[in-house]
Amino acid sequence: MSVLRIDHLRHSFGSLIVTNDVSMSIEDGERHVIIGPNGAGKTSLINQIGGQLRPSAGRILLGNTDITGWPPHRISRMGLARTFQRNNLFQNLSVIENLRLAVQARFGNPLNFITPVSRLRNLRNHVEQLMQRVHLDQGLRLVRELSYGEQRQLEVGIALAAEPKLLLLDEPTSGMSPAETGQMINLIANLPRSLSILMIEHDMKVVFSISDRITVLNRGEVLATGTPIEIQTNNRVREVYLGISP
């Protein structure tokens, strides 16, 4: 079953077409990676899926629900969460405090400081589970004291706090050291298959380590979709994206 389906999506900024008749689907539990050269329309595409951009034409289905043009907060309530290329963390709060705010936002009353003991216990358990899931073990550290890679891990944890069925990751390893990249690969690989993932990524080692299927965008259009092996051996992809002549 498709958790996400995109039909003939189109978006333009004036005369500049950034998404041109894009159709694709994400299956339940799939790890689907979007690749393409700079300016291919990758971020514009997931911004339309997440509600940050309104499509000019086409439709987006999350499960059986048409979410085309919905605002981000409404799409989030339907089970979609995402990260961005630039994080939105509270730098002067601790890891635990950032995660706790995200969990409270998911379950309601994020600013209610008079909370029953049982609910506080459940809240603490949720936060601890999220820390384990994203491989963070120093909950009292302030975010500004974390490494760049650790901040990206925390951002994934905050997205997971919403308990989504579809997670959008926008270049999660961008700017990371090799060690940090390896940690992020391990984190994503260990997320449960009950969660579907759509990811933009430029590091081909990461792409081929994680993906079940890959979609290649070029100039706002789908150049190819297939398994990692199919994409690696596609002559058109090798020429346009990988720069290898057939």
What are these model-predicted stretches?
Residues S2-P246:
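Glycine-rich phosphate-binding loops of nucleotide-dependent enzymes
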